[in-house]
Amino acid sequence: MRQTKTGILLANLGTPDSPTPEAVKRYLKQFLSDRRVVDTSRLLWWPLLRGVILPLRSPRVAKLYASVWMEGGSPLMVYSRQQQQALAQRLPETPVALGMSYGSPSLESAVDELLAEHVDHIVVLPLYPQFSCSTVGAVWDELARILARKRSIPGISFIRDYADNHDYINALANSVRASFAKHGEPDLLLLSYHGIPQRYADEGDDYPQRCRTTTRELASALGMAPEKVMMTFQSRFGREPWLMPYTDETLKMLGEKGVGHIQVMCPGFAADCLETLEEIAEQNREVFLGAGGKKYEYIPALNATPEHIEMMANLVAAYR
């Protein structure tokens, strides 16, 4: 009996190819055209997207990307490539490909890369610790579209999320402990997750519950009292209500109330990116300090740390 050959597909959101208005416009057009991300009526959404949002938003967002751009590309791409390479080194007999929902390298190129290695089973690991229809769901949709065009398809194991995975929680906890050891224990540990429209949760997306699960498990692993850990949501877009409390408004309120020292972690981001390095580490630092706070540190994402790579290896091992 022939032994099954397994490949691993690491999936993440994506990034512009360069910090220019043109590249950002291409990326945002693809991203904001996905119904999993924005499900507004196309009749209303297309004119708004093409006539207002892309022309106005692309130059501004390009400047933000330029402020965090690294020698090897955007932070998300640099750290994602490091994750892919480190996992491939950890699992030398298993092909590992990287694919993005939007931009390059695409999910389709990742699937084709694995099929060229003659794999007949693919373990898909979306690097979103907490499930959401707007992220993990988008990977599922695109994977289905890709495979629908194939005459022969491999077996697929799809990891929905890992919000309460023991290795993941321990890696987060060790990262927090290292920050506390370096900067001192703060008055409050704030866990900021990417937001989604409240309507998505009302319609069945269990993302907020998965975020609460991670928050609870991390606080327990750290032995911290509930009042010392707070969960908020960032990066809202558009006018409809998103999950609350909002990170920026919470930081302003805490600074005004006299909270002096805060450390912020973003457990929902497997790799540092614009939303962590610019929005959280820079913009929200200014919000907190400007409101009266005294000390603010951002705790980096797990990125390609050995603990994170070991977590990935253990996570996919059950499906190989």
UniProtKB/Swiss-Prot annotation:
Coiled coil: none annotated. Pfam families: Ferrochelatase. Its main location: cytoplasm. Belongs to the ferrochelatase family. PANTHER family: FERROCHELATASE (PTHR11108), FERROCHELATASE, MITOCHONDRIAL (PTHR11108:SF1). It comes from the Bacteria. HAMAP family: Ferrochelatase (MF_00323). It is an enzyme of class 4 (lyase). The keyword Metal-binding applies. GO terms for cellular component: cytoplasm. It catalyses: heme b + 2 H(+) = protoporphyrin IX + Fe(2+). This is Ferrochelatase. Its EC number is 4.98.1.1. Monomer. Fe cation binds at residues 194, 275. It is found in: Cytoplasm. Gene3D superfamilies: 3.40.50.1400. One of its GO terms (biological process) is heme biosynthetic process.
